Amino acid sequence: CHFWVCP
């Protein structure tokens, strides 16, 4: 995850 993005 990175801030509001969870790929």
Curated annotation (Swiss-Prot):
Keyword tags: Disulfide bond, G-protein coupled receptor impairing toxin, Secreted, Toxin
Coiled-coil features, chain-numbered ranges: none
A GO term for molecular function: toxin activity
Cellular component terms per the entry's GO annotation: extracellular region
Keyword Transport listed: no
Domain of life: Eukaryota
Cystine bridges: 1-6
Expression by tissue: Expressed by the venom duct.
Subcellular location: Secreted
Domain notes: The cysteine framework is C-C.
Job of this protein: Cyclic peptide that displays a 100-fold selectivity for type-1 angiotensin II receptor AT1 (AGTR1) over AT2. Interacts at high nanomolar range affinity. Binds to the extracellular side of the receptors. Shows a competitive antagonism mode of action on AT1, blocking G-alpha (q), G-alpha (i3), G-alpha (oA), beta-arrestin 2 pathways and ERK1/2 activation.
Further remark: Negative results: does not have effect on endothelin type A (EDNRA), endothelin type B (EDNRB), apelin (APLNR), vasopressin type 1a (AVPR1A) and vasopressin type 2 (AVPR2) receptors.
Protein known as: A-conotoxin cyclic Mila
Naturally occurring in which organism (per UniProt): Conus miliaris
Phylogenetic lineage: Eukaryota, Metazoa, Spiralia, Lophotrochozoa, Mollusca
